[in-house]
Amino acid sequence: MPDSAKALPQSSTAASRSGLTYALLAFVLWGLFPLYFHALADVPSIEVLAHRVIWSALLLAGWAAWRGRLGPILAEFGKPRRMGFYALTTVLISANWWIFIWAIQNGRVLEGSLGYYINPLVNVLLGVVFLHERLNPRQWLAIAIAAGAVLWLIAMKGVVPWVSLSLALSFGTYGLIRKMASFDAMLGLTVETLLLAPLALAGMAWWMSTGQASMGHLGVTTDLLLLAAGVVTVAPLLCFLEAGLRLKLATLGIVQYITPTMQFLLGVFVFHEHFDHERGVTFVLIWVALAIYTFDALRQHRMHPSAGEAE
């Protein structure tokens, strides 16, 4: 998922309703990602990533041209310091996308779900370490419970849940750097995909020249799914940005749990992944931590309503 959109104050009930509709669309679409990437299980995950980058770059560049924003995007490439930040965020988002695709294709939907459940708490912890933000006792309690849940899983399974931790840390760090650099959400993703596009195109050229490309060899359905990678990536992002303009951040903070919850349900009931006692305890502890964190966030929002307004 992208960094949080800046919320603008809206008093209109109609705006709030449309904002909630956009938010539901965004998080439901993200929640359905396992179905999409699982349908591409016969395509190597790195090749799926390449298609996602190429078609997203084309779609985002077209969007920028339509909105008259090509100028600001091209101007970003002439700013060495900002390009340094972009280099970092590009590596992080590509790693995050690839790990998630790989996880879905290798029967680790539940691990992906866990990663996005703990992501908000990782964001809070990164804020403490790098932005020197201060936490109250309830927030520390939530983080401690989440850390305990991960340690419990490691102790019981004897294996580090690297998929979950990698997804949470890569996306959390991605959001942190974007916040520090004050990147515009859509403009930033456009620059990132344009930076990745040459590598993706080079990979595609290599696979085609060596007869390893999946496009055109695995059937029409697979071809259409690969071509849809750009729409699949950009559509929920656009919905999320529209929601961010109409809803308070506190509302978005609650609705965001739709995505990992849908992924959790898909992992258990659709893909029938193994869900034993150890995993059950881990998820329950994470849910308790998130309940504490969300309760505190809502309490803080009621005490300081302006915290959910635009920065």
Predicted regions and their residues:
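Transmembrane alpha-helices of multi-pass small-molecule transport proteins
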Residues: P2, P44-A95, S170, V191-M208, ...
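C-terminal-most transmembrane helix of multi-pass membrane proteins
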Residues: P2-D3, Y257-E311
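Glycine-/small-residue-enriched transmembrane alpha-helix faces in small-molecule transporters
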Residues: P2-E47, G148-M180, A202, P305-E311
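Hydrophobic transmembrane alpha-helices of multi-pass small-molecule transport proteins
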Residues: A5, L60, R138-I154, L165-L167, ...
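Loop-to-transmembrane-helix transition segments
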Residues: S18-L25, P72-I99, W162-S166, S214-A235, ...
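Structural motif at transmembrane-helix junctions in multi-pass transporters
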Residues: D42-E47, W98-G115, L238-V255, H274
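C-terminal transmembrane-helix exit sites in multi-pass transporters
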Residues: W102, N119-Q139, T261-G280
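Helix-helix packing/entry segments at the starts of transmembrane helices
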Residues: L114-I118, A185-L195, V234-F269
